[in-house]
């Protein structure tokens, strides 16, 4: 690790704490990425559009912390990488970051009852239910997600805008799962 880019092999480095819901931060560290590493991962996963999912979930109604990036950055093993995205990536991001998926995650894996630092694994991520959606439905969620990501980039995001966008995304996700109004209310009231 280095605090400055010493040559072209040094690339921005992210650890798990740099990955949060809809926002990617960077603490100014670089890593020399190449043959010098004992077990380098395929560098292509760091060069293409992808979703990073933090391995340690938040203990909140929005437990899953995922963000989209197409930047040339290296992430550590505390973030899982989704590169084989078969749908609109912002749609997928909205599903993963939704309150409904957090509730499902909480009930399915019971992570917060067992350990101080709960983690979820790649195979568990593969179990996440991703509903079928027509292109127009994907686009509707994707546009809201992109608005939310833009708001989150600001030094001081407007909490009312963030809250309203989260609610809209959550409602659209619940619609895709055909939840009844009573079921939607259970999801809306979910807290950890």
PLM regions and their residue ranges:
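Polybasic, glycine- and aromatic-enriched phosphate-binding surface used to engage nucleic acids
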Residues: 1-138
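Non-catalytic DNA-recognition/assembly elements of restriction-modification systems
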Residues: 9, 17, 130-192
